[in-house]
Amino acid sequence: MPQTKRTPAGEALSGLILDLFRLNSLLFTSGDRLVAGLGLTSARWQILGAIVTAERPQPVAWLARDLGAARQNVQRIVNDLERDGLVTFETNPHHRRAQLVVLTDKGRQAFDAAMRLQLPWVNNLADGLSLKDIETMAHVVTTLRGRLENGEEPAERG
């Protein structure tokens, strides 16, 4: 028999998901304001961060996978970053058509400047929150993301 009602946990999670949607929008808006003076947007900053985190040049498809984003969207942003001299493309010895994205010195400087701006912003945002609550939230988000990435989402029931 199909479920007709959310469980208490399902109801709470549904509310949390709606709040996370709103939070994501607010984070992007706030991030855009924070890094606008650097000629960046939150989306560009996010891509630069993925490149830095990767620690070695990767193709756009891999960056998109790491970000959980559509390859076409990441490609568009990477093309903009390349046009502005923040990244460059190098030949991929393993795949002729999938060029590697490489951070330039200008890109590294822009990312580092963004992170310097982020430091007081994130510390102020965290003010008054307990480390335990932040760690619990991080655990919940990581668990949910893992379930969705691994295809553990529940099958639709008719």
Task: Label the predicted regions.
Residues M1-L38:
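N-terminal leader segment of winged-helix/HTH proteins
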Residues M1-P8, L131-G158:
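C-terminal regulatory/oligomerization modules of transcriptional regulators
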Residues P2-T4, F28, N79-H139:
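Charged, amphipathic alpha-helical coiled-coil/dimerization segments
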Residues L20, L48-I51, V141:
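Hydrophobic structural patches
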Residues L23, L27-S30, L34, L67, ...:
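Alpha-helical linker/hinge and terminal dimerization helices associated
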Residues S25, T29-A70, E156:
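N-terminal helix-turn-helix DNA-binding core of bacterial DNA-binding proteins
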